[in-house]
UniProtKB/Swiss-Prot annotation:
<keyword id="KW-0653">Protein transport</keyword>
<feature type="region of interest" description="Disordered">
    <location>
        <begin position="41"/>
        <end position="71"/>
    </location>
</feature>
<keyword id="KW-0997">Cell inner membrane</keyword>
<dbReference type="GO" id="GO:0043953">
    <property type="term" value="P:protein transport by the Tat complex"/>
</dbReference>
<feature type="compositionally biased region" description="Polar residues">
    <location>
        <begin position="58"/>
        <end position="71"/>
    </location>
</feature>
<dbReference type="Pfam" id="PF02416">
    <property type="entry name" value="TatA_B_E"/>
</dbReference>
<comment type="subunit">
    <text>The Tat system comprises two distinct complexes: a TatABC complex, containing multiple copies of TatA, TatB and TatC subunits, and a separate TatA complex, containing only TatA subunits. Substrates initially bind to the TatABC complex, which probably triggers association of the separate TatA complex to form the active translocon.</text>
</comment>
<dbReference type="InterPro" id="IPR006312">
    <property type="entry name" value="TatA/E"/>
</dbReference>
<comment type="function">
    <text>Part of the twin-arginine translocation (Tat) system that transports large folded proteins containing a characteristic twin-arginine motif in their signal peptide across membranes. TatA could form the protein-conducting channel of the Tat system.</text>
</comment>
<dbReference type="GO" id="GO:0033281">
    <property type="term" value="C:TAT protein transport complex"/>
</dbReference>
<keyword id="KW-0813">Transport</keyword>
<comment type="similarity">
    <text>Belongs to the TatA/E family.</text>
</comment>
<dbReference type="InterPro" id="IPR003369">
    <property type="entry name" value="TatA/B/E"/>
</dbReference>
<keyword id="KW-0812">Transmembrane</keyword>
<feature type="transmembrane region" description="Helical">
    <location>
        <begin position="1"/>
        <end position="21"/>
    </location>
</feature>
<dbReference type="GO" id="GO:0008320">
    <property type="term" value="F:protein transmembrane transporter activity"/>
</dbReference>
<keyword id="KW-0811">Translocation</keyword>
Length: 71
């Protein structure tokens, strides 16, 4: 019940071809590929921002410690 057989996948593929047409499928696949590539690139770009946020939080905690010492 949990997995599809080859026959099920062929039926799904036939329905997709009927809905979108044979010419549109490569364009759709290309769009999905670009979306995945962009998503992965953005995920890699997140790392420097996280490092900056971590450095900012460490700076703020240092300032709080200095303020506490001055009081």
């Amino acid at each position: 019940m949990g997995s599809f057989s080859m026959g099920h996948w062929l039926i799904v593929l036939a329905i997709i071809v009927l809905l979108f047409g044979a010419k549109k499928i490569p364009e759709l696949a290309k769009g999905v590929g670009k979306g995945i590539k962009t998503f992965k690139k953005e995920m890699e770009d997140e790392t420097p921002v996280e490092k900056i946020e971590k450095a900012d939080s460490e700076t703020q905690s240092t300032k709080q410690n200095e303020t506490t010492k001055n009081v």
